[in-house]
Amino acid sequence: MIRTATVDDVAELAELRRTFTFEDSTEGEALRSDFEESFTHLVSSGIRSGRWVVWVAEAAGAIVSHAFVGTIEKIPRPIAEHRAIGYLTNVYTRPEFRGRGIGGRVLDAVTAWARESDVELLMVWPSEASLAHYERHGFADRGEPLVWLHPEDPA
């Protein structure tokens, strides 16, 4: 079953975020002591306000896949236009549930919502391994946006 998350899901989403982060290692990196508190605050308030919409797929009563979309309202213009931009992030499916089409159905739910909500575009920074997956679900490479990175950002 695919549905939008509620604040009741936040603790499980935090656990999945931790799993997702450490799946590809980060051995030796310092753990944030405030992770759960910070995650819970940001995601709970985001869900309540509508700034973040989170889709989850469940199997046997547990969340097995999710995708987060943060919305950015556009400044109005005096012509007809779409109202928002969506930042798609934290897309994850538990390893034991991959290859079953679950993540694709979650992405399809996200893009259906975007169409219905008049979102102008969804942007995502895919890994090399996930690029083909996004392309199969309607995402296209439009070139890199210009970005400013904090001087201390490891990226």
Question: Which stretches of residues belong to each language-model region?
Answer:
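Conserved GNAT-fold acetyl-CoA-binding loop/helix
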Residues: T21-L42, W52
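Conserved beta-strand in the GNAT
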Residues: V56, A62-T71, Y87, Y92
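Conserved acetyl-CoA-binding loop of GNAT-fold acetyltransferases
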Residues: V119, E135-P145
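Conserved beta-strand-loop-alpha-helix junction that forms the acyl-donor binding cleft
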Residues: L122-A132, V147-E152
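A short beta-loop-alpha structural element at the N-terminal edge
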Residues: M1-E15
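A short helix-loop-beta-strand connector motif used in the catalytic cores of GNAT acetyltransferases and
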Residues: H41-V56, Y87
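Conserved acetyl-CoA pyrophosphate-binding loop and the N-cap/start of the following alpha-helix
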Residues: F97, G101-A109
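Conserved GNAT acetyl-CoA-binding A-motif
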Residues: L107, A114-P126
